[in-house]
Amino acid sequence: MGYVRVIYQFPDNLWWNECTNQVYYAQDPMKPERLIGTPSIIQTKLLKILCEYHPAPCPNDQIIKALWPHGFISSESLTQAIKRTRDFLNDEHKTLIENVKLQGYRINIIQVIVSENVVDEADCSQKKSVKERIKIEWGKINVVPYLVFSALYVALLPVIWWSYGQWYQHELAGITHDLRDLARLPGITIQKLSEQKLTFAIDQHQCSVNYEQKTLECTKN
């Protein structure tokens, strides 16, 4: 099965190739000149929903539903997601992602290029296979070092997961996780717990939660 190549042009010759999920500057969209990088999972979802609504603004509730489908997220979390995405896109003047008062957010797209041919998966090397992703529904899981801080919940902000040999960042602002719920999930083995770190195994991945740095790092075995 292949993928249709869709490339979005933003102001200042900034491009987002949805197929490879790469953001870069270029005169020719097929010849990246300066790579910005790969958007995080939350940033990718945000770009997709804003592009789907373009040229209309996307309502805040629709953005929240697209970014965090499994749980309630405050408006502050949405604001932080917008800010981080603007920072990633070098949108310091807030002209690429605009805040439309009482309507939501709108993305400034110059043009959209859609390939007429379906490309092979090899051409979309950054496409992440669902089967290769860590199978955790983060909106339904709680992680807390209850043996040490029984009443303290730890908010995990950036989460890194492993897929096709690449690191991807996933921001989970505002979500807390309960270790007891995590341990009940099928396929998860809690291996080590301390004041600073939790280690567990899931779906052929070795994962480590660092409470101080608020990160989760997973590598494929």
UniProtKB/Swiss-Prot annotation:
Q: Identify the SMART domains for this entry.
A: Trans_reg_C (SM00862)
Cellular location(s): Cell membrane
What GO annotations for molecular function exist for this entry? DNA binding
Can you cite a GO biological process for this protein? Answer: positive regulation of DNA-templated transcription
Query: Which Gene Ontology CC terms are recorded?
Result: plasma membrane
Fetch the Pfam families from UniProt.
Trans_reg_C (PF00486)
Q: How does it sit in the membrane?
A: Single-pass membrane protein
Alphabetized, the UniProt keywords read: Cell membrane, DNA-binding, Membrane, Transmembrane, Transmembrane helix
Keyword presence, Membrane: yes
DNA-binding region as annotated in the record:
5-109
Q: Per its UniProt record, what InterPro entries does this chain match?
A: OmpR/PhoB-type_DNA-bd, Sig_transdc_resp-reg_C-effctor, WH-like_DNA-bd_sf
Residues that span the membrane, as ranges: 143-163
Q: What does this protein do?
A: Involved in TCP pilus biogenesis.
What name goes with this protein? Answer: Toxin coregulated pilus biosynthesis protein P
> What is the scientific name of the source organism?
Vibrio cholerae serotype O1 (strain ATCC 39315 / El Tor Inaba N16961)
Q: Which gene encodes it?
A: tcpP
